[in-house]
Amino acid sequence: MTKPKDCLHLSYVCMSATNETMRPSYILDRIRRIFPDKKELQGQRMENRIVTNKSGLEVLIIGIRELLEGNHSHEKETLQLYKLYLKHGDARTLERMKQAMQYQNLPEKLAEQVTQLIRLQDMAMSVSKLEQYASCAYAFFLRYILRLEERQIHGIDNRNVGMILHGAMEQMFCYVRDQKDNAWETLSEQERDAKTEEFVNENFAKEYAGQELDAGQYEVLRKSLIRIGKRTVQKLQAMMDASYKPRYFEYAFRKKLQVGDEQLSLVGVVDRGDLYVNEAEQTISLRVIDYKSGAHEFDLGDLYEGLELQLAIYTDVMRELVDQEWNKNRAETERYKIVTDSMYYYHMQDPYVQAENETEAEEARERQLTYKGLARDDAEEFDTVLAYAEYKASALVTQMKSGVIDKNPMRESNKTACDYCAYKDVCRFDEKYGNNRYHYTKHSAKEKEQLLEEMHSVCHGQKNRNR
């Protein structure tokens, strides 16, 4: 880069041979900062790309595709090139090109008979399945309707890790509730760590029962999970509010959801529900915690698109449960007011950090080990989020029951639903030639006020229609 005397041209590809978006080198960002006034040109002039007969055909294909998409910026050059190939006796090639241009990689809606079968087999739907449908309807179709699965390989993956840690947390919190009357302050560090290790070992043995694993790999993973388990329980104990008491653990639910003339059951498991009972004010405050073995944050933009429904729906389910358990058979004047105070994700981890000493390392870990979610700073805002989650779930089920299985993977910034999809070879999603399109997220989480306003408008309109 330092050798040119007169001019330096920098270029980069935007798309790989398999039509996947490619990010440019980090060097280009540095160059842009050094020369902020320099303009970036998008590609070569059309005529400069025509070098051989083959490259000319490629340029012609791009030009015709632009015309089909309503882009007439190269119309004159494309028509001239078409006439040139037609004149030189390439009519057969042009006919094949024309047929190829009509190719569309678009699935049709499912027939009514098929959707009737779906209604029979899927009257119970997990919230995670709805999120998958919102992420990409076609991937949902392949996985849950056709039931295509990757070859099962016995081994270790994130699902195993999640099951082990979830099971250990459930046992630990039940132990403190049943044996210590929820008095976490009476639990010594030695007893806490010993019980955590015991519960992790129990769940580890249960999860991998009957499987042959490499002894070394097995032991490294087991010790790692014990370390994560101890760190998680230690942190959750430290964050324990004196007012709130953990009451519900791994609560499996079935929530009725009205979809048109049909009823569907939403199913799921709530990791933890904490209660604060204020007898003087006759109120019960609810806090819902959902454990995650991977990094996860609550995002209003994702909730709006249907990608983030779990936490809000789980919180609404727990609100109904608490109301039923505490207010059943009570007179109207004696009923508790149920207040949903907050809903959080907690990432179960023992993060590696860079620091000068152990004190700084511990402080860095503390900053990462926090609840992430939504607190009830504004009652109307919180209730809008819960109401919108139920509305969006109903809307997704309605779309699903009508047979829509579009290849519409969600795209947000540089992330797409296709990035880790197991069905790429079946789907063959292709923006360039298959007429496939990404579904871009409408709002980012930063547009909080606009998001809440639209959610409120949608929910308010739905209530008026149901009257």
Where are these regions (language model features)?
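Conserved helicase C-terminal RecA-like lobe
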Residues: M1-K3
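RecB-family 4Fe-4S metal-dependent nuclease core
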Residues: H9-S11, A17-G43, V51, S55, ...
